[in-house]
């Protein structure tokens, strides 16, 4: 993507430096994910699976990154590409090879974990109310008019509680209701 900017190159570099200094944990996570890419790309019979995180939710192994629900984030054909002036990791995608780096892995992991959390919440919500639609991180349910307050409270309670494997994760929810999705 290209963005028009009136900032000088020096100012842009300064802003990047400030971001990296203030958000050192983010940068460290990017580096851990770069290392995971390296390990997955060079996996051999002597390699040992290991957890990417302190909570033992994300297992780096030959197959990719194993998520808490047992599914994997997999980068088929992952390799270190040295064909251009700047080397990079690439993997086979639908339309050829796509480059990837630690920050991209973080984005993929965050999106996958968010989807797992919402999916688990939907299973719990389904015990009392019928989810009929999801939009990003929103769950749309149907409830009787005289049960809207109870339904809202139940759904907020469920969606504001992190799963056991993510204890301490700040999750929150707000609820709206109307006669149709467009009214919310």
List each language-model region with its residue ranges.
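Conserved catalytic core of nucleotide polymerization and phosphodiester-bond processing enzymes
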Residues: 1-184
């Amino acid at each position: 993507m290209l963005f028009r900017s009136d900032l000088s190159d020096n100012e842009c570099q300064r802003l990047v430096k400030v971001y990296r200094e203030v958000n050192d944990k983010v940068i460290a996570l990017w580096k851990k994910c770069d290392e995971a890419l390296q390990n997955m790309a060079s996996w051999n019979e002597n390699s040992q699976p290991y957890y990417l995180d302190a909570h033992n939710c994300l297992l780096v192994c030959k197959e990719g990154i194993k998520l808490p629900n047992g599914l994997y984030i997999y980068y088929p054909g992952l390799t270190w590409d040295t064909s251009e002036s700047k080397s990079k990791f690439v993997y086979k995608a639908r339309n050829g090879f796509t480059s990837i780096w630690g920050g991209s892995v973080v984005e993929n992991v965050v999106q996958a974990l968010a989807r797992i959390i919402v999916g688990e919440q939907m299973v719990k919500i389904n015990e009392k109310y019928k989810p009929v639609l999801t939009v990003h991180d929103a769950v749309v349910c149907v409830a009787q008019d005289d049960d809207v307050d109870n339904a809202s409270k139940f759904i907020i309670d469920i969606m504001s509680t992190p799963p056991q494997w993510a204890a301490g994760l700040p999750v929150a929810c707000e609820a709206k209701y109307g006669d149709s999705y467009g009214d919310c």
